[in-house]
């Protein structure tokens, strides 16, 4: 191979020499590729022709064989970005680097997230590459107080703005002279006075624009700094030219534009300050989550209570929490009982009763009892830490709707500069032939009215505020793409057990005396069946004392038979009673039929061969399940139930909550296929589940929604997590998505519309440069302000919300 390149990849999943040989053989089948795979080091070294192949092709080949390639992720803080052209350029350069799988740069958060192959590159190389582009970059420090850093930066912007405004205000008065024929002191019209005021604004306050423009042009790019630097420099240096003519006596009335350059810079700084201030509010939701974390814990060591910093708590430590204190970390109660306010997690204001062996979540509030607990999850593994991580990732992610804005931003500045040059040529040759000033003013107006910032901020600000507001309500979107996809959903499929129902059977009906119940519970107490557990718990709630069984026998398919204190007990169905010649009165038979029709498991009880009672057990509906289904129907969304239960039970539950479509008797492995069937009908499907067996269906669906009380596998497979299991959050999640996407469209319409309309108006000479500059400064502020409206959105779905 004449032109060769070498790359090394870390491979995961190899177990023997056959694995490494298989990968090596497959890679070497590619044209002009020489690959060696080492099982011991778990690395593949590949020499290849870069004109024919790239690293991603080798990764796809390895993954297609069923193995993985190690990928690491790093988050970087970037400062110095001024508009969408900056973030687009950094993103493009990072994605072209060897070893980078994917890089996204968020202008709003001023952060980059990069997935890379550690054998090809590292975080330091990424930082260095960004710095070469002219921006400051560093690896994100999670322990660093980002809020105070941003507050300092905002304060610095304000100081520069004030200084610039003080120097520009006298120059601004000159504009009023031209506009309103006002009289002002002669000093204000003196060229030297104007020069002294404008120069520090241009080259000290405005130096940042020159630096930004130079760095971008040096690296073959162009951003907002280029537009500002060129536009203000044109006005400033033309004024210098006129001033020299005045000093030489060539003119007694120089046409100076010092006020244009200085006021433009001041207005742009004002817009940037307002933008930064508004952007800081977009992360309020994350700041509020961070503020929920406990700062210290009371640990029990050698019989003594000690207060220690939260970061010193380890798994297995014994902690004491008193009334009014926050639970420091996730754990399990080993002593005491209390009520816990979990509203920060679930949004539910009513405290939850907690006893020994119950789990407690870090940062929730202990209301009224002292408890002793064992720490089970600490640091970054706690529930709150995971919530914060999901919200951070969602806020820094990109929605597919942003792609068009990103593409346009990359070409925006060169196009605007070209339009400005064309404007100058047309004016000086056709509109006002040979007259320099009108051509200059029109071209400056074109340069300064164009705003790539609004394009870059349109989507990420809405995503940040929208996902933050959703998180405050217990709805966690994993990323911008899930926000965008959710608004398209027209069909929602709900798992039954643990999703629509509580997943814990309870006694719903009982007819009989306490003695019969005591004997029944005693007979069932050694069984691990959920129905037996429900009966035993019911008896304990009645404070009945359970004794011991003398004999016990299960009657397969029919029930049980037991002897307790010389009493013969039969518990089961009609067949069991009939086999023992026990007749059923009509009202008992009718009750049995009624319970079965309602999807309940009904059991007859006979003591000493006489019917003494009937009991019904069922998995109860979750609170608000019926209301949630109704809201989804009101939004025009079809709702279906998917369950492995028999059709009668499923139909009974569906009838109670108002679900029309029931898919029952489904094996766990068939759930994903049922989702695919609905998708083949052209439906956009969301699957809601909580168990391990729901994970394939959650992945297959257009959107997977996991119930937060469910398994980690289900939560990992889903794009949205509903904290606490309240089904009312499902229509709220869909509404949050719709409201956020609607807000993004408004922003994009404004950003595109502003530039499409503003640039031609400026080119026609209908706007003074300072008016154009003010419009540019306020355009990005308006986009951020519109996004901030989402902070106040009430997550109340509308009927058939579009």
Swiss-Prot record:
Catalytic reactions of this protein: Cu(+)(in) + ATP + H2O = Cu(+)(out) + ADP + phosphate + H(+)
Domain HMA: from-to ranges: 5-70, 72-138
Membrane spanning stretches: 161-181, 192-212, 224-244, 256-276, 411-431, 438-458, 748-767, 771-790
Gene (name only): copA
GO biological process: copper ion homeostasis
Cellular component, GO, one term: plasma membrane
This protein's name: Copper-exporting P-type ATPase
Residues at which Mg(2+) binds: 690, 694
């Amino acid at each position: 191979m004449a032109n060769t390149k070498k790359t090394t990849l870390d491979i995961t999943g190899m177990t023997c020499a056959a694995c490494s040989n298989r990968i090596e053989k497959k890679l070497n089948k590619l044209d002009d590729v020489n690959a060696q795979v080492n099982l011991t080091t778990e690395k593949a070294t590949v020499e290849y022709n870069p004109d024919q192949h790239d690293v991603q092709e080798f990764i796809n080949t390895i993954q297609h064989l069923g193995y993985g390639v190690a990928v690491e992720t790093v988050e970087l803080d970037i400062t110095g970005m001024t508009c969408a052209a900056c973030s687009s350029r950094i993103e493009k350069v990072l994605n072209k680097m060897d070893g980078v799988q994917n890089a996204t740069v968020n202008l709003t958060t001023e952060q980059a997230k990069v997935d890379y192959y550690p054998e090809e590159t590292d975080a330091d190389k990424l930082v260095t590459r960004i710095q070469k582009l002219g921006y400051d970059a560093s690896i994100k420090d999670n322990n660093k107080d980002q809020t105070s850093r941003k507050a300092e930066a905002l304060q610095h912007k304000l100081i520069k703005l004030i200084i610039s405004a003080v120097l520009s205000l006298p120059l601004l008065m000159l504009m009023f002279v031209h506009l309103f024929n006002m009289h002002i002191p002669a000093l204000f019209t003196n060229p030297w006075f104007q020069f002294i005021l404008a120069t520090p604004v241009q080259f000290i306050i405005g130096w940042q624009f020159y630096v930004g423009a130079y760095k971008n042009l040096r690296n073959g790019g162009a951003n907002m700094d280029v537009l500002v630097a060129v536009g203000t420099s044109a006005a400033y240096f033309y004024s210098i030219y006129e001033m020299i003519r005045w000093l030489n006596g060539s003119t007694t009335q120089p046409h100076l534009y010092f006020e244009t350059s200085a006021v433009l810079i001041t207005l742009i700084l004002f817009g940037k300050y307002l933008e930064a201030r508004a952007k800081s509010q977009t992360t309020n939701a994350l700041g509020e989550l961070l503020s929920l974390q406990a700062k210290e814990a009371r640990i029990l060591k050698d019989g003594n209570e000690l207060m220690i910093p939260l970061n010193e708590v380890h798994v297995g430590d014994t902690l004491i929490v008193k009334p009014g204190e926050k639970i420091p970390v996730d754990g399990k109660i080993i002593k005491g009982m209390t009520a816990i306010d979990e509203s920060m997690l679930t949004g539910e204001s009513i405290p939850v009763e907690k006893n020994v062996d119950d789990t407690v979540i870090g940062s929730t509030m202990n209301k009224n009892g002292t408890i002793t607990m064992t720490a089970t999850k600490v640091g970054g593994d706690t529930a709150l830490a995971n919530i914060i991580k999901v919200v951070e990732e969602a806020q820094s992610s990109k929605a597919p709707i942003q792609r068009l804005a990103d593409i346009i931003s990359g070409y925006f500045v060169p196009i605007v500069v070209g339009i400005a040059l064309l404007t100058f040529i047309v004016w000086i040759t056709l509109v006002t032939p040979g007259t320099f000033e009108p051509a200059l003013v029109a071209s400056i107006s074109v340069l300064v009215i164009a705003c790539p910032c609004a394009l870059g901020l349109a989507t990420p600000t809405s995503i940040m505020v929208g996902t933050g507001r959703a998180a405050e309500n217990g709805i966690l979107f994993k990323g911008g793409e899930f926000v965008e996809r959710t608004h398209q959903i027209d069909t929602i499929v709900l798992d039954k057990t643990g999703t629509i129902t509580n997943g814990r059977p309870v006694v719903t009906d009982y007819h009989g005396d306490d003695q019969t119940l005591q004997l029944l519970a005693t007979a069932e107490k050694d069984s691990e069946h959920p129905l037996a557990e429900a009966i035993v718990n019911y008896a304990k709630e009645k404070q009945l004392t359970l004794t011991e069984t003398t004999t016990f026998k299960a009657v397969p398919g029919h029930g049980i038979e037991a002897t307790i204190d010389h009493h013969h007990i039969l518990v089961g169905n009609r067949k069991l009673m009939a086999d023992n010649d026990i007749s059923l009165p009509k009202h008992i038979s009718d009750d049995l039929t009624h319970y079965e029709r309602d999807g309940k498991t009904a059991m007859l009880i006979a003591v000493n061969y006489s019917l003494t009672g009937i009991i019904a057990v069922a998995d109860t509906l979750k609170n608000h399940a019926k209301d949630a289904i109704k809201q989804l129907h009101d939004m025009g969304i079809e709702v279906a139930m998917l369950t492995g239960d028999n059709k009668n039970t499923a139909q009974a539950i569906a009838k109670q909550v108002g679900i029309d479509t029931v898919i029952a008797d489904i094996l766990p492995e068939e759930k994903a296929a049922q989702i695919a069937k609905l998708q083949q009908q052209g439906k956009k499907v969301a699957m809601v589940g909580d168990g391990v067996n729901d994970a394939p269906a959650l992945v297959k669906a257009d959107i997977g929604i996991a119930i937060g009380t469910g398994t980690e596998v289900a939560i990992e497979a889903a794009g949205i997590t509903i904290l606490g299991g309240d089904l009312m959050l499902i229509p709220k999640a869909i509404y949050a998505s719709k409201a956020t996407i609607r807000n993004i469209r408004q922003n994009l319409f404004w950003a595109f519309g502003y530039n499409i309309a503003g640039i031609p108006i400026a080119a026609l000479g209908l706007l003074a440069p300072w008016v154009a500059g003010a419009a540019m400064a306020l355009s990005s502020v308006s986009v951020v302000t519109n996004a901030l409206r989402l902070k106040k959105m009430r997550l109340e779905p509308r009927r058939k919300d579009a």
